[in-house]
Swiss-Prot record:
Compartment annotation: Cell inner membrane
Keywords: 4Fe-4S, Cell inner membrane, Cell membrane, Iron, Iron-sulfur, Membrane, Metal-binding, NAD, Quinone, Translocase, Transport, Ubiquinone
Protein name: NADH-quinone oxidoreductase subunit B 1
Cellular component GO terms held in the UniProt record: plasma membrane; respiratory chain complex I
Subunit-structure text: NDH-1 is composed of 14 different subunits. Subunits NuoB, C, D, E, F, and G constitute the peripheral sector of the complex.
Membrane topology: Peripheral membrane protein
Binding positions ([4Fe-4S] cluster): 52-53, 117, 146
Native species: Thermodesulfovibrio yellowstonii (strain ATCC 51303 / DSM 11347 / YP87)
Cofactor mode of binding and number, as noted: Binds 1 [4Fe-4S] cluster.
Purpose of the protein: NDH-1 shuttles electrons from NADH, via FMN and iron-sulfur (Fe-S) centers, to quinones in the respiratory chain. The immediate electron acceptor for the enzyme in this species is believed to be ubiquinone. Couples the redox reaction to proton translocation (for every two electrons transferred, four hydrogen ions are translocated across the cytoplasmic membrane), and thus conserves the redox energy in a proton gradient.
Length: 199
């Protein structure tokens, strides 16, 4: 419902950081709010389906659930994606490939672990499987289930949108294609994690 107020000329704060100036038909906000709104309203996930959870992920992208209405468009290349959805069992042979794809994604980037196998290793507690994607990548949203329903994936994507909306915009210091990102805050790469576990 839209209320038109002609008598008020002072800015009215409708949300923290967002003001409306009625007489000038102007909205005043911070650049961080606009950037966060843009990032959360247009998620482009890179789908990485490795097992039976991938079938549910494909069903979520089909016309019945229509992810486009949430601003979510599946991408086929990591260079155009900002969210990686890992659905299924991750083997130790596949882990370096996933880490490589993750590092090809532009900042800010997010990871969703979909299914019991991606969250904790699931029923595959063997020497050849990674016991949760968080051993190799920083995970933002966990979606449990074997396999989780498409509604659960949609809820996870909406939770990620809420998280993006509330987090401050990170200054990466990008200048002419060279990004100066503080790597100390990121989780270690797969090779260094693997070497630390041998000690």
């Amino acid at each position: 419902m839209i209320h038109v107020v002609d008598t008020v000329t002072e800015p009215v704060e409708i949300e923290q950081g967002i003001k409306i100036v009625p007489a000038a038909n102007t909205i005043i906000t911070t650049l961080d709010k606009i950037a966060s709104w843009g990032r959360c309203s247009s998620l482009w996930p890179l789908t990485f389906g490795l097992a039976c959870c991938a079938i549910e992920m494909m069903a979520t992208a089909a016309s019945h659930y229509d992810l486009d209405r949430f601003g979510i468009i599946m991408r086929a290349t990591p260079r155009q994606a900002d969210v990686m959805i890992i659905a299924g069992t991750v083997t130790k042979k596949m882990a370096p490939v996933i880490v490589n794809l993750y590092h090809q994604m532009p900042e800010p980037r997010y990871v969703i672990a979909m299914g019991s196998c991606a969250c904790s290793g699931g029923i595959f507690n063997t020497y050849s499987t990674v016991q949760g994607v968080d051993e190799i990548l920083p995970v933002d949203v966990y979606i449990p289930g074997c396999p989780p329903r498409p509604e659960a994936l949609i809820e996870g994507l909406l939770k990620l949108q809420e998280k993006i909306k509330t987090e401050p915009h990170k200054k990466t210091g990008c200048l002419s294609g060279v990004c100066l990102i503080d790597k100390s805050q990121r989780r270690c790469s797969y090779e260094s994690c693997r070497d630390n576990k041998k000690d």
